Each structure stands twice: as structure tokens, then as C-alpha cells.
Amino acid sequence: MEMENSASQQLSISVSQIVLRQREYFLTNETKSIDFRLKQLKKLKKSVEKYSDDIYEALWKDLHKCKEEAFLTELSIVINEINDHIKHLKKWAKPKKVKTPLYLMPSKSYVMYEPFGLALIIAPWNYPFHLMFAPLVGAISSGCCAVLKPSPYSQYTSEVMQMIIDDTFDKEYITMIQGHRDVNQALLSQKFDFIFYTGSPDMGRVVMEAASKNLTPVVLELGGKSPCIVDKGCNIDFAARRIVWGKTINAGQTCVAPDYMFVHKSVRKELIAKMIEYVEKFYGKDSQESDHYCRIINDKAYNRLVSYLDEGKIIYGGQCDAEERYIQFTLLDLSQQTTDNRQQSWLMLGVMKDEIFGPILPVIEFDDIDVVRDFVVNRPKPLAFYYFGEDENAYDLLGKTTSGGVCINDTILHVGNDHLPFGGVGESGMGKYHSQESFLVFSNKRAVLKSSNKIDFAMKYPPYDKIDLIKKLM
């Protein structure tokens, strides 16, 4: 016990010293220079390109993620984000003039963007490179210093990211600290100026509680159960292909993956047949033999997912291999629940309580879209919402539901558009990022009003005998 306490104290001291050195460096104001920020972004891009083969190899070892998928979902997103910030940073960082009311004249008003200061970025294991470096780009472009904490579960990728950070930046500017829960606790006990967390809602609550002690602003990129609705009038072929892709990319270990699917009874049979056709077209008859099909991250996650397979009727899939942590894409029919209250019956199932985060897709048949809408509305607000069907119903659902993002007649693609803000709402998170939103989220919007030193507005002073005139000017 004494040894554990001693190790904990040493870790706390080490983390405290890192934070202290970064705060001292930030106070030199060097990171506030636009030229400095652009230089760091270009250095980061060069290092990412230098280590790209190592990143690909690490992602393969951690997740069985093929090079093509790693490029599309990890490296290209980060490189594009860096390029976007390099191109637009000067414009984004320029003070923004705003109108000044007549009764405050003669004055000038503007908003200036200054870095929060020291940022803590905690990233998950499912897209370990993308979800660490994309927020980091925002921290750099805003002028922050940063401490990075990767997930211990994607260890190979964490090691490569450590090499990139150590090779690119001075530790008093940007540094990475690896470890498990003890490191998280040590970091969250420190006073940061901003915390950016991506991960589970449960850990998000821990982060928010820790941040509240210092009133530290946070962005929480969490998850949740993102519904997918396939209505009559949809393009069944497109719906099948796009849902299978959205659910099987990274073996379903994606925060915005379709979590469960409501399908109208009139299209159910044809949709299921098409989905089976496409999953075998993508990965072959045996997806375990495909180099393009990922694996589950660890044994704990694998065992949790396997337990869901007994909670419904398997329409397709269900094959597993514990040694490889392989789970076949599985369609799980929940429509056969025969209790008086089907919704209550579904909600008793683990597969409908928890975010699935794997290649298992519950299928629920419906014939009344209003019932589906009410089901979604009465659940925690999801990170994403997917609808396949006619435009009229799509826009009606948009107006009566809430989510972090939406795709109509597709899945996941909204995340790939860097012109759209990405983030959750309610239990699926708070705060948005990507492109300019990333710059803004790490920046304090400082309101500035500069009054004239030659003319004064005398009516604003007591005894307020001109109040009627002031009212007319307001």
C-alpha cells in the first residue's frame, strides 16, 4: 500500500511539473503569434506524413484496420484539417468588427480571439489517431499549449503518436502522457484552462465533475444510441448499401454508427436481403478472411458484444472467434418480442440499453412512423440520426427530434464534411469542432470596446436628466 501511495504521489508530482512548465511557457506569449502557429501546423503535417507507414502498421495491429480504411477515416481527415487551418487561420484569427449602438458612441467594438491557455485532450481507442490529432489541430491554431492523453487500449497507435509528438514539439508546448486510470486521475486533478474529451458518457461525467472544481470549460464528444429509420418510399438498394457500410466500418466501433434500425414492414424483407447481399459483396462470404474487416479492440468489449447475440433472433451473421476477437456483421431481429408493451420489452435488453459499439444491428419492424418518432424523442438525445425515405417525412422528423447530427438517405458522411460542426447534444455530448469550429472552441471570444479619448457622451452620467433622450437613442 505504501509503495502504491508513493507511486501515485510521484505521478502526481510529475504531472504537476509538466503542467507548471507549460503554463510558464504559455505566459511568454510565444504561442499567440500567428506565424508561430502556422509553423507548428506545418511541422505537424510533415511529421504525420513522415510517420504515415508506422501509423498504418499500428492501426492494423490495434484494430485489424486496413491501410485503405485507415487513410479514409484517420490520416486523410487529419491532413485535411491541418491544410484547412493553414489556409484560413489568418482570416479566422483576425479581430471581428461588430456594430456599436448609437448611445455608446463615439466608440468602436470588436471581438478578438485569444487562446484559452493550457488544454488537456483525452482521446479514445476506436479512431485513436484521428480523434487525438484533429482536436490538437484546433488547439495549435488557437494558440494553446496542450497535454495529450491517448487510450491505453490502442497501444501500438499510442506509441507512434508519442514518437510524432516527441519528434515535433518541445515538451513545454505540447506533450503526450500515456497510462491508465491513474494517469487520468492525475491529469484531471490539475488545473487546465480547457478540457477536450472524447469517449464514453460515463467517463464524460467524471471529466465534467473534475472540470467543475476549477470551473474549467469542456468539450465532451460522447456517444449514444444513434437510430436509423428505413421508411417506405426509400431507395432500398442505396439504403442497404449505406447502412451496411456505416455499421461495418471499423467493425461498428464508431460513435456515429447506426445503433439500431427501425424498418417499415413494407420494405423489411427486400432491405434485409439487400443488406446481406452487400455485406458479402464488401467482405466476401466469410468476412473473417477479409483484410478489410476490423476486429474488436479487447476481450472485455468482445464478451459484452457476444452476450447481446442471445437477446434476439439472428437473421444473419452471429459467427464469432474469441481468439481473433472477430464478430461477424449480425442482424438481430427484435420484432418478435411478444409482451404487451413491446417498447418496454426492448428497453429491458442490454442491446437496447447500451451503446452497442460493434457490428450488431438490432432490427425492429414498424408500420406507424409516429410511434418510431415518439420512441426516439423519449430516449436520450443521440449523437446522430439517420433517415431513409421521402423528403416530407424526413423534414417532419427533423423538426420533431433532436440529435448532434443528421444524415438523410445516408450514414456517417456528415462527419466527413469539415464545413459542418461535429458534436453531440445532451447525453451525447456538448461543444462542436472541425474546421473553424475547432479554432473557435479552443479560443476565448474577448469582447473589446474602445471609446474616444476626445469626445465624451455626457448624458450617460448622473443626474440622468436626459434619460428620455437616451431612451429614444436606444
Language-model features: where?
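Conserved C-terminal structural/oligomerization subdomain of aldehyde/semialdehyde dehydrogenase
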Residues: 2, 36, 327-474
